[in-house]
Amino acid sequence: MRPLAVAIALVAVWPSGRLAAQTEGSVLTVLPGSTRSAALGGAGAALVGDAGAMFANPAGIATIRHLSLEGSYEPYLAGSAVSAAALALRVRRWTWGVGAQTLDYGSEPVIVPDPATGGRRGMTTGESFHPYEALAATSLVYRRGFAALGVTAKYDRQQIGVEVSDAWAGDIGMAIAVFDIMAVGVSVQNLGGDLGNGALLPRRTRAGLTLNYTDPQGTYRLLTTLEGQWTRDRHAVLVQGVEGGIVTGGVGLVARLGYATRPAVTDASRITLGGGVVLGRLAMDYAFQAYGALGGATHRVGLRWTP
């Protein structure tokens, strides 16, 4: 881990003077749960049909055919890395999902004051510490007709040095999917989530609408998504995304563009870009987001398989 990686990651999400350790105790739970979502500005409440949808709205996995697998990896800020994986299985009206996300800050040697210099310099002990945040979640969804209702139970654990904090929380969500034409989704995330010492998982309400303008099983693809996000003690955010491409014979390319009216509490660009390669039931995704004062950008890659 590069020096100050933990602090930089926190500042990138939360404003200075009010870091996550004070009120909102998680970086990981505010990041997009899938590469497709990341490319569409972080929208996800009404993106249905993939296993990774459970990280934004548990009801989003209700429309999978039988099975869905998804995984992603992103070298994040200051040498840290974000990864996610999810699985969803549908049996009749019920869909069950399980997923995990991690934010790995790498490892750093333990440094203590050097008595030979009167404590003015440090010395390594030969040991190292490995800060991280990890989230495990499971979802259960019931669908009847066009409507679905789902719940998620999640466990978040964070460790920095010898300090460990953890919390249990839950999400609830609903979705209405009208064939492949449109989907409406609403979710409330991180109910509960007390990490102790006044730190809480960020409570967030999301409402979204996704529209398909073409048959998603046909040659041409065109989709838009619009989502409002309301996070506790933060300004509201409106996310807009568009996805389009050409797929023929089960093989094709898609491009994605997202825009989020984020409040000035993060150094991330308001614009996100991405794309993907479609190979039958397998999709390979990519997402890009620039960062200003921190320099550089993030690149996220992912795989989705829906047999």
Predicted regions and their residues:
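Bacterial N-terminal signal peptides
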Residues: A5-P15
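Sec/Tat signal peptide C-region and signal peptidase I cleavage site
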Residues: G17-A21
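Subset of outer-membrane beta-barrel
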Residues: Q22-P307
